[in-house]
Amino acid sequence: MQKIRPDLDIGRNIQRMRYLNGFTQDQVIARLNLMGIPISKSTYAKLETNRMNIKVSELLALARIFHCDVGEFFKNLL
């Protein structure tokens, strides 16, 4: 049976998708806020560095912003 990797990769995958889309953290935060997801710069930074758990609503919003499937954030967890 494969071991499941720590949730560390979720934050890394969020950061990877942000880089691939050419966004800064501030741009992502602004888009999240426009979508009704109130998030500060420090909170967003904590999500990317795995110092805070992400909410499902935030994950769904990020998938819309990055035009990707939610599964992208779970790559390399297995």
Language-model region placement:
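Residues in the recognition helix of alpha-helical DNA-binding motifs
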Residues: 17, 31, 47, 76
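Short amphipathic recognition helices of helix-turn-helix/homeodomain-type DNA-binding modules
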Residues: 72-78
